[in-house]
Amino acid sequence: METLTVGLGDRSYTIRGGSGILPGIGAFCRELGLGRIVAVVTNTTVGPLYYGPVADSLAAAGFSPLRVELPDGEEFKTSATMNIIYDALIDGGLTRDSFIVALGGGVVGDMAGFAAATYLRGIPFVQVPTTLLAQVDSSVGGKTGINHPRGKNLIGAFYQPRAVVIDVETLTTLPEREYLAGMAEVVKYGVVLDPQLFAEVERNITPILARDRDVLTRIIMACCAIKASVVEKDERESGLRAVLNYGHTLGHAVETLAGYGTFLHGEAVAIGMVQAAKLAEHRGEATADDTGRLRALLESLKLPVELPVFAAEAYREVLLRDKKARDTGLSFVLNNGIGGFSIVRLRDLSEVIDVCGIGG
């Protein structure tokens, strides 16, 4: 098992990663000094697979677990689904001494974390991500929230977990499409922050596709270390943390226009990264070889790279509603070659529309 710490003063927490560590979650939560009643928020896909061993471990450690099972899918990341969680917490008698375990992928983690942030004005929660995307990205850093029909993640809060527990064994039951979508976030870290990680993914396509546990543990914890370093410097996304939105600006637009659930989040990010690379190339911050290398890696991971066709005005409208849009324009993260980045603010989206071939 590997461990690392996200250093945020009195809100610091530990990330534990390895193979076969899920049965130890009860003892780990006991070490944290958490209250007796725990709501395990999961979904209809993950619950039948992993709620049993998690609940058994928690019960053996002296906790009283409550099962809260949600429908599975990005399309259910809504206020209506949040009320399912709130109702269960109220009916289960959870108090400020109680806590939540988020057992699932990014949607479960975002909603369970938002419930923890808002129920009784805040109770502790522990992230137990079971998808690759959640393990390398959304479970670390404290972003929680839900979607709105007019945009993704428009409602939410920054609220840090008490701990993150990553068991790569959970990836053995992950559908192929979701697993590969998670690799998009791994590639993201390499493109803008770590050229060595990018090269390692290029070298290890075969073991990655075979879900080699040792390779995955190494790559996942490397991503978590990068994410932790960024969050420590910029917890609330006022500066450096914005780099983690590489590929997300157009990616979120793709998700919104296509309808939540049409593209998996990682698939949309893969598309967005290629478009960001085109923009970087157009501005002289990357070469055609850099863009080609990124595109080839994503394609080798069986990820989409082509922007779906919607009217230019539809893209423009969704982009301007992006939560990263401010009075000074819309923030875009661009790659500087492989391993570097810059952040530009665009008042006029015509350049993006022209370079990316939007609407055509």
Curated annotation (Swiss-Prot):
CDD domains: DHQS. Its cofactor is Co(2+); Zn(2+); NAD(+). It is found in: Cytoplasm. GO terms for biological process: amino acid biosynthetic process; aromatic amino acid family biosynthetic process; chorismate biosynthetic process. InterPro entries: Dehydroquinate_synthase, DHQ_synth_AroB, DHQ_synth_fam, DHQS/DOIS_N, DHQS_C. Zn(2+) binds at residues 185, 248, 265. NAD(+) binds at residues 72-77, 106-110, 130-131, 143, 152, 170-173. GO terms for cellular component: cytoplasm. Catalyzes the conversion of 3-deoxy-D-arabino-heptulosonate 7-phosphate (DAHP) to dehydroquinate (DHQ). This is 3-dehydroquinate synthase. It comes from Geobacter metallireducens (strain ATCC 53774 / DSM 7210 / GS-15).
